[in-house]
Amino acid sequence: IPVLVSTGQQQLAAIARAMACDPPLLVADEPTGNLDTRSADKIIQLFEGFVAQGKTIVMVTHDPSLTSRTHRNIIISDGELINEIISRSLPQLRHRHMLEFTKIVEEHIYQPHETIISRDGNVDYFFMIRKGEVDVVLLDNQKNENVISRLQAGEFFGEIELLRGGKSIANVRAGDQPVEVLALPRADFIRVINESPITAEAIGKIVQTRLDERQISD
C-alpha cells in the first residue's frame, strides 16, 4: 500500500528501478528533496557505492551538504555555467559575482619556472590557479631562494598586494610543470570584494596567514 511506504523508501525504490538496467550514468534531480537527514544519508551512501563501481552520478541540487560530498561541482546561475575554478577559489561570493568574473577573467599559461609576479613589482591581477602549481619564493639574507609556499589548483595569489597596497612581497613563479591561471583585473576584484564582506573576511584571514609565513621565513 503506497501510504505505508515512507518518502525515503519510495526514493530508494525509484533509484532501484533506474539502476535495474545497469546504466553507466544516473541523473538524479533533487534526490534527497523532502527527505529527513537519515534517509538522505542513505541515498548518498547508495550513490557513493555506485561510484565505487565505476558509475557516474549527476545530481541536481540546491543543498550545500550534498555538494560538499561530490567529486566535482558545477554551478549554474541564470542559465549560464560558472567557471569551476572561480567557485572553488571564492566559494563565499554571490553567484552573480561568480558569473561576472567568469565572463571577464583572462586565461594565461606560464611555462615551468617562469616568473608570474616579481618581488617589488606591481600586482595588477588577482590570480586563480586552474592547473599546475606555483611557488612563492623569498630570498634570505644570503640571497638564497626559499620556497615558503606551493600553491595548487583552486588556490589563489596576488591578494595581499591588491588588498593592502604596495609592491609584491615575494616572487611567484610556475612550478615544474606548465601552469594555467585565471587573471582578474585589480579594479574588478576590489569592487566585488567591497560588495562581499564575507569573501573579504575569508581572504583577509588567508592574507594574515601568508604574512605570518613570510615573517617566519625571515
Task: List where the protein language model places each region.
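Conserved ABC ATPase signature
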Residues: 1-5, 9
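Conserved catalytic motifs of ABC-family nucleotide-binding domains
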Residues: 22
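Catalytic Walker B motif of ABC-type/P-loop ATPase nucleotide-binding domains
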Residues: 26-29
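A small-molecule sensor/coupling module
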Residues: 97-100, 168-170, 187-218
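Hydrophobic anchor residue at the start of the ABC signature
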Residues: 15
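Regulatory nucleotide-sensing modules
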Residues: 89-147, 153-155
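Helical segment within the ABC ATPase nucleotide-binding domain
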Residues: 41-53
